[in-house]
Structures are given as structure tokens and as C-alpha cells.
């Protein structure tokens, strides 16, 4: 197999998608607390891409802007690298991991200080064709034997 035939895949893509069609995008070190970002991500998980984008566009949460940008990026990756149609894409995986926390100090009365935790998030979204997602749900999971 020549180098032009071989398709380079990252380890991250292997863990998120395996050999199935789809694309992903992530925003790392986003200045949003993970709890607030998870509220927004939970709204779009499993939705068709167009519906999820319209939902995010008018969502009042501050995290919805960042999630919107990540979803747009994932759709663009699917269209350009995979050649998939935007209309039949579904948000199959949506996860928010905790990033590093920046510690800051706020002066208080009588010479004291309290700590402020400025939390960050790693937001990852995976888009796949609807038929692949439906097929994945239809296959039964293997049970662990004791």
C-alpha cells in the first residue's frame, strides 16, 4: 500500500469513530464551566444537525455560542474530509470534559482573601450519518460475563 492510498487516522478519531463514517470537532480550554456546558450539550445530543444548530442559535445559555461553533466545525469537517451530506448528519456523541482550573484570589474584608476557581472545559462533538447511528443503536451490546 503506497502512502497516497493509506489514509492517516489519528488516535482520537479511532477512539471516537472507529472505522465508521463521520467527523468530529473539539474546543479545548473553553472558558465555560463544565456543568453549564453539559446542560447545553445534553440538549443537542441525538438531534439532526440542522435542528441542533437552530436550537443552539436561540438558546439563552452562554455556552450555546461555543457549542454552536464546535458543531459548525464538525459539520464542515464531515462535508470536506468525508464528503457527507449536511442534511443526513446527526449529533451522535456529545461530551464535555473538565479542563484545567485557573485559581484566582479575591480580596475580602479584614485582610482575608477567598479563592475563585475559573473552570475550563473540553467540548467534543461527533456527527455521523443518521443510518449509521440507527444501525449502531439496533445492534445489541455485549454483556460482560462474570
Curated annotation (Swiss-Prot):
Pfam families: Ribosomal_L22 (PF00237). One of its GO terms (molecular function) is structural constituent of ribosome. Keywords: Ribonucleoprotein, Ribosomal protein, RNA-binding, rRNA-binding. Gene3D superfamilies: Ribosomal protein L22/L17. GO terms for cellular component: cytosolic large ribosomal subunit. InterPro entries: Ribosomal_uL22 (IPR001063), Ribosomal_uL22_bac/chlpt-type (IPR005727), Ribosomal_uL22_bac/org-type (IPR047867), Ribosomal_uL22_CS (IPR018260), Ribosomal_uL22_sf (IPR036394). PROSITE patterns: RIBOSOMAL_L22. GO terms for biological process: translation. Transmembrane segments: none annotated. This protein binds specifically to 23S rRNA; its binding is stimulated by other ribosomal proteins, e.g. L4, L17, and L20. It is important during the early stages of 50S assembly. It makes multiple contacts with different domains of the 23S rRNA in the assembled 50S subunit and ribosome. NCBIfam families: rplV_bact. Part of the 50S ribosomal subunit. Belongs to the universal ribosomal protein uL22 family. This is Large ribosomal subunit protein uL22. It comes from Nocardioides sp. (strain ATCC BAA-499 / JS614). The gene is rplV.
